[in-house]
Design a protein with these regions (language model features):
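Active-site phosphate/ATP/adenylate-binding loop shared across adenylate-forming ligases
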Residues: 1-26, 31-262
Length: 262
């Protein structure tokens, strides 16, 4: 392991447990922080963030809103304007599935990414360590099978974009520095250059990795789908692994076929 997942998770849970004892005060401090940091943004100026001194002030000044209310600000951000919704520049644009109409763009800042990393991503390791308290860390934190892939997708202006569930990994590798050595697949499988179904390829690597200790997925249904694929294509996978071949039924494109056959 290159990352101390036990320590990372322990620190995350310690922060969580400490926060639960003063949740209301932390929420008030967070509101004050958000208002102070974004008072000079277009949205903050519109609703007078700099003059808000209490929750009641906030409730009086800032109306309930939906995504339509933010769309003009997002459009200006995408056009190159700055400090619209937040003073910090977005580092990622999450794109919704469009299930209720046209897909929506949701700007995400670096601060939000750090909250995601230190709370959600790291917290999972803490919960695993806490639940299996009698196990040694090396028995829990070996090679990882991440069932998702995080294609390097960008908007025409160069901003990182994609599904919110992929955003953290894309951001962690924003400069190409994400260390994938703890994962059972090569880095190019985790971060393909384009969106492509790579379940077959990932399973080939996962089934061959004897040090595998964890299966990761943002959504459980994705994990179930990968396991269903393995169950339904068991003989094909084993045959190809034994003979170093890639069956046409894998659906892989030429470059990926050549990587596995080579």
């Amino acid at each position: 392991m290159t990352t101390d997942y036990a320590a990372l998770g322990r620190a995350s849970l310690e922060r969580l447990h400490a926060a639960t004892g003063r949740a209301r005060q932390l929420q008030l401090e967070e509101l004050e922080h958000i208002l102070g940091c974004n008072a000079a943004s277009a949205y903050g100026r519109r609703y007078g963030f700099s003059d808000i001194r209490s929750v009641e002030d906030y409730q009086r000044r800032v109306p309930l809103s939906c995504h339509e209310d933010y769309e003009p600000y997002v459009e200006r951000l995408l056009a190159g304007e700055r400090a619209q919704l937040t003073c910090a520049e977005p580092v990622y644009y999450a794109i919704t599935s469009g299930s209720t109409g046209v897909p929506k763009y949701v700007p995400v800042t670096a601060e939000d990414m750090l909250v995601h990393y230190n709370g959600i991503y790291a917290g999972v390791f803490g919960m695993v360590r806490e639940y299996y308290a009698q196990e040694q860390p090396e028995a829990l934190f070996g090679k990882i099978f991440q069932v998702g892939e995080f294609a390097r997708t960008r908007l025409p202006g160069g901003q990182m974009c994609g599904a919110r569930s992929a955003s953290l990994y894309q951001w962690l590798d924003r400069d190409g520095g994400f260390d994938a050595s703890d994962y059972c697949v090569p880095k190019e499988v985790l971060f393909p250059d384009r969106v492509e179904g790579l379940t077959y390829a990932k399973l080939r690597f996962a089934l061959a990795e004897r040090g595998l200790t964890a299966i990761h997925g943002v959504f459980l249904h994705r994990v179930v789908g990968v396991l269903d694929y393995a169950r339904e294509n068991w003989e094909l996978l084993l045959h190809d692994m034994e003979h170093g071949t890639v069956d046409a039924a894998s659906g892989l494109s030429g470059p990926w076929r050549r990587k596995l056959e080579g």
